[in-house]
Every structure is written in structure tokens, then in C-alpha cells.
Amino acid sequence: ENIILVLTIDIALNRSCRQLEWRHLIVMKKVITYGTFDLLHWGHIHLLRRAKEMGDYLVVAISSDEFNKLKNKKSYHSFENRKMILEAIRYVDEVIPEHTWEQKVQDVQDHQIDVFVMGDDWEGKFDFLKEHCEVVYLPRTEGISTTQIKNDLLAVSK
């Protein structure tokens, strides 16, 4: 279900008491994507821009520090810092935490999501969401990844 904003405009015609009521419906298409978004780079920005182009409102769910520990992942930036960075990006309308793998169906329902977007390295992993929304896997940006950045930084420091 979409968010519907109803604007009402009253127009007085020829100084009479007659009024016309116009209703204009605006339906927002909502998109969601998930990730850690640590060491933000142009591949992330490219994903966020393409996701935003698929709708009017982009929700980004980022892995909480606790969830990263469960996945045996270590982030350089804390959840709060990653959230602050993402909120400053013009393509992003809302940032929410990702605490578990299982929360995606609930997020899609709670935020009335129309399109679920992930990189194609996750191809097929979220097809179960197709009964709730459209699922799109976008090609990854070639030549960049957070893992590559971390490895390059380690190599430079040696």
C-alpha cells in the first residue's frame, strides 16, 4: 500500500459562495536497500542513486554493530556514524537499523515498500520477498569494494 497525500484546494468563483474542491492524489513509490555501508565509496553512491531512481522515497537499512558481530563482520565506523553519513546523502530519505536477517518482511510491510533493491552479488537470496514487493538485483560497480579498500589500506601500511 502506498502513502497517499490528499491536497484540497478551495476556489471562490465570482465572489459567490460556490466552492470547488479539487483533490490531487500523489502516490509515492518507496524503495528499500540494505547494507553495512562502511568506508563509503562511489560504488555505494552508485547503488543509492540507482535505487532512488526506481522510486520517490529511498529507505536504507544499515547493519547495526550488534548484527555485524553476529555476521562476524567488523566495521571501521560505528552504526551511528554510518547512519549520519548516509543521512547526509541526497538520494537517501530515511535510514533504519538492520538487526537481523529475518526483519526484511516486517520492514517491507512497516514502511510500505514497493521495490526491494540489492546488489547482484545477492541474486536470488531475497526472492521470498516477491510476494510482498518487486525485488531487483542491480549489477555491482566494477573496480571498487569495501573489502578491496581495506586490503589496499593494509598493504600500504606494511
What is each residue range found by the language model?
Residues 4, 8, 12-16, 21-158:
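Nucleotidyltransferase catalytic core that binds NTPs
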